[in-house]
């Protein structure tokens, strides 16, 4: 767990005094990654200057840079890495001119971010949580046993500070890396949809499902172990309440509790945000499909009219009498059944006016649920509204009610992944499947 004992002015003065600075253009960063990769293949973790020059040569060739000044540029790059405390140089009088180089903690941290921490592993997270659970249980047992100050430092404070806190930081880093991966997936989906949304649908579905599954897997693993971890932290906290000289342990336990709560809460929040993005992408795809169908129909109709004199055509339509003995006399055909899906500009103006009036009335009536924070059962509400209108308008009224209701909030049961029960909404067999909206 990150903890700063110095104040901000002290840290600023310290950084200025030591002339700390990092400048890594893409070629220098590539060189550092190459050094880290080659260094990982060696048991001793040491590299000679000649090996660094060879690594620089590979990077220089990849960037199509001239090879005539390779020695000078490699020497400048190595010296720059040493100056920025990314590499440590060791020399000896016996082997003058043959220096040995090792990556510094700063260099390892930068390369580790780019190389090793890019993959999410449920097994790795489970092992980390298992280690944390074991350390916390031993620390809680030691806290309940009690002892002198040395006992608290060695058996309680040290495991919490140098094992549990560091693993919590590692899990937090994993979440932040997944935040970056989510943003990268969003960029990939945007590029796919901008190129050819027809061919991109399957790829988008794969990216969305993989990211959603990874987030859910991470959160399920955290929540499964979260209660047990919090219980052991509470045991330690209860044991320190009777000791006035253990403020340092109590403060550390509080920090760990806050860190664990933050990790679990952000995991759930990231899932909620991703669900919203998933719905947004699917809505965009559905809109694109509808627009494309109407665009193709309009294009064919326009082309047929333009080429009428070259290729005449005839339009035949049938207007058969209604079978009064087989149909309800009061039933009116809806426009959608006759014309199919049409753009809003081609819909009947009268129906638009009626729909807008109904939407305004229903929106005002449903707002009471949000104001009073009362759960909204869509099945009951839709059934109540449909009982006030003729059967021919049931579909349109139900659609308006549902559109206005989902704008008020969401159902927390949607996030459980369990399907809602089907509820009848009229006496003619129509049903709706929706959870109770309880989060506005």
From Swiss-Prot:
Chief location: cytoplasm
Keywords (A to Z) from UniProt: Calcium, Cell cycle, Cell division, Chromosome partition, Cytoplasm, DNA condensation
Recorded GO CC terms: cytoplasm; nucleoid
GO terms (BP aspect): cell division; chromosome condensation; chromosome segregation; DNA replication
Annotated compartments: Cytoplasm, Nucleoid
Domain of life of the native organism: Bacteria
Record InterPro entries: Chromosome_partition_MukF, MukF_C, MukF_C_sf, MukF_M, MukF_M_sp, MukF_WHTH, WH-like_DNA-bd_sf, WH_DNA-bd_sf
GO terms for MF: calcium ion binding
KW Cell cycle (keyword) present: yes
Region of interest (Leucine-zipper), residue spans: 208-236
HAMAP family found in the cross-reference section: MukF
Task performed by this protein: Involved in chromosome condensation, segregation and cell cycle progression. May participate in facilitating chromosome segregation by condensation DNA from both sides of a centrally located replisome during cell division. Not required for mini-F plasmid partitioning. Probably acts via its interaction with MukB and MukE. Overexpression results in anucleate cells. It has a calcium binding activity.
Subunit structure: Interacts, and probably forms a ternary complex, with MukE and MukB via its C-terminal region. The complex formation is stimulated by calcium or magnesium. It is required for an interaction between MukE and MukB.
Similarity-based family: Belongs to the MukF family.
Protein name stated in the entry: Chromosome partition protein MukF
Species: Escherichia coli (strain ATCC 8739 / DSM 1576 / NBRC 3972 / NCIMB 8545 / WDCM 00012 / Crooks)
Origin organism lineage: Bacteria, Pseudomonadati, Pseudomonadota, Gammaproteobacteria, Enterobacterales
Gene designation per UniProt: mukF
């Amino acid at each position: 767990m990150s903890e700063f004992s110095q104040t901000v002015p002290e840290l600023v003065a310290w950084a200025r005094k030591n002339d700390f600075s990092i400048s890594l253009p893409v070629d220098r960063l590539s060189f550092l990654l190459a050094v880290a990769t080659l260094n990982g293949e060696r048991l001793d973790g040491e590299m000679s200057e000649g090996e660094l020059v060879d690594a620089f040569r590979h990077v220089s060739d990849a960037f199509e840079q001239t090879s005539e000044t390779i020695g000078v540029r490699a020497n400048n790059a190595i010296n720059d890495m040493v100056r920025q405390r990314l590499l440590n140089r060791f020399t000896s009088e016996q082997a003058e001119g043959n220096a040995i180089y090792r990556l510094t903690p700063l260099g390892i941290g930068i390369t580790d971010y780019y190389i090793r921490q890019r993959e999410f592993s449920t097994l790795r997270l489970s092992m980390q949580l298992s280690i944390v659970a074991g350390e916390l249980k031993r620390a809680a047992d030691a806290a309940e046993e009690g002892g002198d100050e040395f006992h608290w430092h060695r058996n309680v404070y040290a495991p919490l500070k140098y094992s549990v806190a560091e693993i919590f930081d590692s899990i937090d880093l994993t979440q932040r890396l997944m935040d970056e991966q989510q943003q990268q997936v969003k960029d990939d989906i945007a590029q796919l949809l901008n190129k050819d949304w027809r061919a991109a649908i399957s790829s988008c579905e794969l990216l969305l499902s993989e990211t959603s599954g990874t987030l859910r897997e991470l959160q399920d693993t955290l929540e499964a172990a979260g209660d047990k971890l919090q219980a052991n932290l509470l045991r330690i906290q209860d044991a320190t309440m009777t000791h006035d000289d253990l403020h340092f342990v109590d403060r550390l336990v509080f920090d760990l509790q806050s860190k664990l709560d933050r990790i679990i809460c952000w995991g759930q929040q990231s899932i909620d945000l991703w669900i919203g993005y998933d719905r947004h992408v699917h809505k965009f795809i559905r809109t694109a499909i509808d627009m494309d169908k109407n665009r193709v129909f309009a294009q064919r109709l326009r082309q047929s009219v333009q080429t009428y004199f070259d290729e005449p055509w005839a339009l035949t339509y049938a207007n058969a009498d209604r079978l009064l003995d087989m149909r309800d006399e009061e039933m009116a055909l809806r426009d959608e059944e006759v014309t199919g899906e049409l753009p809003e500009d081609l819909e009947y103006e009268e129906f638009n006016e009626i729909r807008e009036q109904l939407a305004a009335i229903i929106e005002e009536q449903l707002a009471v649920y949000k104001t009073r924070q009362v759960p909204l059962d869509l099945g009951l509400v839709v059934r109540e509204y449909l009982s006030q209108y003729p059967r021919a308008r049931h579909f349109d009224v139900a659609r308006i009610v549902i559109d206005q209701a989902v704008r008020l909030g969401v159902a927390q049961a949607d996030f459980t992944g369990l399907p809602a029960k089907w509820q009848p909404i009229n006496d003619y067999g129509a049903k709706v499947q929706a959870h109770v909206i309880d989060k506005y």
